């Protein structure tokens, strides 16, 4: 087992972290999973359930102090500005995304920690093969700072493993769909927002064109993938970092059609966001995840059909409880 005793999740208040923290705590124990985020306000629930530290991941001195305080041996670096948000301020995106990762890797090197940091379909660009994108392929045609940061992160993670022996591991996440945390500036956000608007008002305005295929994944599969990779026998990991993982690929019309099976009056129209559309057009339609399946047994449980059933049920529960308006 990789997790020896103490886990630190940096950027715990984001879309992935807000669900990964309780997931890991349920497996390894509340006191063995420390959540850290720049915003204590948005992490109240996490802080009430287990150890929490307020941390700007660019503050290497405080970051190191937290690692030493808790005897951390596994770091999850989830700090990032997402694709569409990053295009509004590319310098800030670079400084945050690469600065947090560099600190994480250096602190891991100095304190004998393993590191997980997520990559993304955003690591691919417009000249990458669009369908069944291979594990190892061209990544020199990125058109977003988010993608540039992801490619840099993949290379840095490989470098710290090869040069310093840091146990680095990562996956290339597709768009992630969740009912727990609202999306925060990503190109695939429409695939979450559509479920909320379906429940709220029975209609949705989509900001990417019909026929725009992108890989997507339901959050429970994403959480399981993280644990499965981090628990994997290192001798089996030929790639180690940046594994393609896939679950489903669809375009907006298909998700709308699936929703109509449960809400027949649901309507959708389009108002295209040119920034998000350009980003989506540069990404793969689907990824080949055969390396993840072969090297550590990756296999998703959710497809568009059973995910839609669960999302509609869970979002309606939130609506009925007054948790969303």
Task: Write out the residue ranges for each language-model feature.
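Short, small-residue-biased leader/transition segments that mark boundaries at the very start
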Residues: 1-2, 252
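N-terminal Rossmann NAD(P)H-binding glycine-rich loop of SDR-like oxidoreductase domains
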Residues: 7-27
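Rossmann-fold cofactor-recognition segment
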Residues: 47-59
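NAD(P)H-binding glycine-rich loop region in Rossmannoid oxidoreductase-like domains
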Residues: 57-96
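Conserved Rossmann-fold NAD(P)-dependent oxidoreductase catalytic core, especially the SDR/UDP-sugar
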Residues: 77, 102-145
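Conserved catalytic Lys-bearing alpha helix of Rossmann-like short-chain dehydrogenase/reductases
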Residues: 98-104, 138, 149-157
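NAD(P)-dependent short-chain dehydrogenase/reductase
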Residues: 158-213, 219-224
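C-terminal substrate-binding subdomain of Rossmann-fold SDR/epimerase-dehydratase oxidoreductases
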Residues: 207-209, 215-325
């Amino acid at each position: 087992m990789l997790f020896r005793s103490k886990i630190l999740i940096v950027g715990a208040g984001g879309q992935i972290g807000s669900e990964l923290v309780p997931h890991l705590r349920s497996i390894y124990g509340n006191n063995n999973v420390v959540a850290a985020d720049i915003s204590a306000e948005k992490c109240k629930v996490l802080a009430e359930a287990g150890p929490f530290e307020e941390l700007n991941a660019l503050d290497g001195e405080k970051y190191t102090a937290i690692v030493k305080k808790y005897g951390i041996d596994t770091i999850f670096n989830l700090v990032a500005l997402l694709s569409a948000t990053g295009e509004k301020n590319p310098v800030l995106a670079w400084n945050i995304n690469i600065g947090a990762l560099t600190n994480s890797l250096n602190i891991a090197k100095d304190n004998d920690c393993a590191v997980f940091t997520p990559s993304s379909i955003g690591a691919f660009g417009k000249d990458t093969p669009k369908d069944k994108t291979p594990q190892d392929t061209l990544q020199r045609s990125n058109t977003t700072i988010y993608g540039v940061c992801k490619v840099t992160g993949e290379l840095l993670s490989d470098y710290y493993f090869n040069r310093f022996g840091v146990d680095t591991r990562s996956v290339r996440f597709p768009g992630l769909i969740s009912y727990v945390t609202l999306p925060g500036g990503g190109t695939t956000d429409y695939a979450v927002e559509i479920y909320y608007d379906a429940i709220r008002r029975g209609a949705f305005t989509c900001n990417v064109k019909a026929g725009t295929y992108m890989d997507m994944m339901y959050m429970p599969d994403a959480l399981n993938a993280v644990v499965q990779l981090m628990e994997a026998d290192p001798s089996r990991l030929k790639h180690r970092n940046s594994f393609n993982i896939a679950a489903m690929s669809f375009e907006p019309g298909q998700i709308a059609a699936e929703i109509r099976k449960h809400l027949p009056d649901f309507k959708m129209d389009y108002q295209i966001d040119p920034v998000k559309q350009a980003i989506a057009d540069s990404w793969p339609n689907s990824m080949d995840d055969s390396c993840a399946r072969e090297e550590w047994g990756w296999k998703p449980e959710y497809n568009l059909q059973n995910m839609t059933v669960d999302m509609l049920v869970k979002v309606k529960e939130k609506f009925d409880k007054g948790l969303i308006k």
